[in-house]
Amino acid sequence: MSEFQIDKIGLKVGLEIHQQLAVKKKLFCNCPSVESEEYPIQFFRKLRVSKSELGEFDPTAIFERSKSKTIVYNANPESSCLVEQDEEPPHEVNENAKNVVLTIAFALKSIIFNEIHVMRKLVIDGSNTSGFQRTMLVSQGGYLDVDGKRIGVQSVSLEEDAAKILGETADTREYALDRLGIPLIEIALEPVSGKPEEVRKIALALGRLLRATKKVERGLGTIRQDVNVSIQGGNVVEIKGVQKLDQLEKIIEYEARRQHGLVIISSKLNNMTLDRIAKEGDVKNVTEIFRNCKSTVIQKALKEGAVVKAIRIKNFSGMFGFEPYQGIRLGKQIGELVRFFGLGGVFHSDELPNYGIEEIEIKEIKKTLELEQNDAFLVLAGEMKKVEPAIESIIKRIEDAKVGVPAETRMATSDGETIYLRPRPGASRMYPETDIPPIIVTETELVDAQKMIPKSWEETISELENTYDLNPQLAVQVFDSNYSDLFEIICQDKNLSPNFVASVLCSTITNLERQGLDSKLLKSSEILRAFNLLSNGEIAKESIEIIFSNIMSGKTHSIDEIIKNASISKMDLIELESVLDDLIEANINIVHEQRERSIGPLMGIAMKTMRGKADGQIINQILEKKIREKLD
């Protein structure tokens, strides 16, 4: 395997940031931008591909059509209406959303158009009931300064968010409509050359600018970063769905390594004599050969009435398993492609015998395909209507391997890799929206938007430090967290220490997440109530973590129930002193032996029984006082 050097491959990365706007209503109707928990309405759609005005088909639409999926939509009248169901024309554009985008365009020194045209962007994966997403270009050009470098802005757009996917089977894909239509800002930056950590800094700086407006949503799922990655000699690959900054560097590094590995593979292929695969002569039905095979994947498919097909690739032996870098193989790329047709997978000759496919089947395949010594083969099983388009895509992908890096769209995974999603869209993907007239941007709107440009990053952090007496590190943590607005609301209560509130929101919740607990279960209303109870003296500081832990674990959503079950209602001072008197008497030997140093072990014993029932600092003070009295 080769040694990968990321700074020697001509890496270029372009960022597209998609951020939900906090404007309460959806983009083209009056439905609130809220998340539903129940969906009493359900309906089904089968989206079909159609030609553009120029009579052309978009490649992504053709690809999605080949999967032949039924789309199931779930809706709640509290968060969606007939507009989301595509049973009613869109209403006028959300003026608040438009004004926020104008402000951000000004902040980026972008040139705003005086007339905005709504367009339809073809989307046929089912995430839009209409088969398209409404989007409008608001401005072009501009820049963002990051660490002394000026990063160009390509465009700023306002668009509607897609439906939320709930699940997928081989034949269906299921969505919820509560997210569909929520206003999004899309900012596309110019591609930059540099290391992944530099790209992360750019994304962080842009995210901070957006958050400084206080008009964008926060939390997982409210911001998504699409990353366009290319290397010297390769096409641009779009990576969708990067939700966390921590993922960004790993994904860029993996994708750069994957692409360079494909370039190495193509270089090797171009030094070989290869024939183009002929579907008529090189593809055979080998179902009967596998009737009694031990492969669980193939046997499962056969029980469902599948066919098994084999493809001959002349002079290709060893190329599916060739690994220029660890984990980068052409066989793996083709496996990703096949899975998106709803097939269990594909087997290639470089990995066989294995997976229940034995020498007896391999021998029969070689005979049926008339293989020569240096030939390779692929085997796949599934319904005929899925296998046929999958074979066409495999043949094209093998041809693309000779070129190097094919232009495609991939999806980011949680472990920092990418998997195949679909082909790159073509120019015929976008066409005008006929239900909405052009939107005029008035001079008054421009003046008002310019007045709303947020303070700089440095000014914002300085203001947090001075207003709440935070150190610089904690001020940055508060601003970058999902709870900065909530922090300011909680700190209006003068009984609460801003430093303690910041520590809970930025450290306690993060630590609970690291233990595998789910912060999405912790609502802002519950956080506010917990701090109100603390301010009123009904619970101790230590109770906050106990309450959050119970909610984030999914055990209960009721704070009253947690207080009752965990026995964390606050002790009064008389009861506390009585309990500590009993504790000292029960451990009087420790007090006499260790004297003043006995505070440590006694404090540990006290906190085991009184954690959440009394403030730790008060327990410590009373213990110290009572130990001194005993020793005197």
Annotate the PLM regions.
Residues D469, C491-V501, E538-I539, E593-R597:
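Structural motif
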Residues A401, M430, P498-V501, I509-L521, ...:
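M16/insulysin-pitrilysin zinc metalloprotease superfamily fold
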Residues V478-N495, I509-Q515, K523-F531, D581-I590:
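Short amphipathic alpha-helical segments and their helix-coil junctions
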Residues R597-D632:
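Short, amphipathic C-terminal "tail helix"
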Residues M1-I453, D493, R628:
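Basic, nucleic-acid-interacting segments
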Residues S519-L528, K541-T609:
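Strongly charged, low-complexity linkers/loops
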Residues T442-L446, I453-L486, F500:
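Long, charged low-complexity interaction segments
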